[in-house]
Amino acid sequence: MKVARFTKDEDLPEYGFVQEEKGKKIIAVLSGNPFAGDVDLSGERVDLSEVRLLAPNFPLKIFCCDDFMDFYLKPATCAMGPDDVLSIPDWSRGIEVRPGIGIIISTPTRNCPISEVEKHILGMTCILDSTALSDRNHVCNTAFDDSLAVGPWIETKIDPDARLTLGKEKSESIRNLLKCALKNISFISSFSTLLPGDMVAVRSQNKQIFELPGEAMAKIGGVGYLRSFVRREVP
C-alpha cells in the first residue's frame, strides 16, 4: 500500500492511498492524518495528476545515517517533497547529493530491541539528502533549509531485495541500508523517543556533486522515483 501526502490548489495537506485505476494512478483520500490516529476513506478520489505531492510525512525528527551509530539530526525545515528545489546555500561552493531510504515510524518507539523494530514501522520512502560543500561546521552543512527531498510516497510493504538507483546508472540493493536502518532505530530509541511520522534515513555511498543548477533523481524499485531540481539560493 502506498500512502501519499498532497495538496489540491494549495489547500491544507491531505493524505490518501495511491491506487491504479484503468491504467492511471488515483488517490483514495483519507478522512484525516494517519499519524494522528485511526482514519477511514473519505469517499473522495482524485487523479494523481491533479494534485501536488508533498513530503509523505511531516517529521518532528529526522535522523540521517551513513552507518551504524554514525548519524546526524536534521530539522523538519530540511524536508521537502517531489519536484521541489534542493537549495545550494549562497555561502557554499555547491552540494553533495546522495540517495537513500527513509524508514517512517508509525508508533511511539522507546527502548526497542532490534527484534521488535519492524512492529513500529509504517513503511519506506525514497530520499535525496544534500550536504553543503563549505568550510562551515557539520551542523550548518547538513541542517540547512530544503536540503532533504522525500517521496514520492510511503510504501508500507518493504522489499529488502529492491534496488536503489541514483540517476540512470548507479544501482544497488537496499538490503544493507535496511539492516543499518533497523539497527539504528533500535539504538536511537535507547536515548530518544521516536514518534509517529519521524524518519530514520540511511544514505547510499553513491553521490552527485552540484556546483551549478541541475536535476537529481533517485528511484527505489516497488516504491517509485524522486526528482529534485537543484538551484542556487538567492541571498
Language-model features: locations:
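Extended, compositionally biased flexible segments
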Residues: 2-99, 211
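Catalytic-pocket segment enriched in acidic/His residues
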Residues: 5-7, 13, 17, 21, ...
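A generic local secondary-structure boundary/capping motif
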Residues: 52-54, 86-95, 109-116, 138-140, ...
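Glycine-rich, pocket-lining loop/helix-strand segments that form or immediately flank
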Residues: 69-79, 127-144
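A short, structural micro-pattern
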Residues: 73, 97, 118-120, 144
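Short, structured patches in soluble enzyme cores that scaffold and shape functional sites
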Residues: 74-76, 99-107, 123-132, 152-154, ...
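Short Gly/aromatic-enriched secondary-structure transition segments
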Residues: 113-125
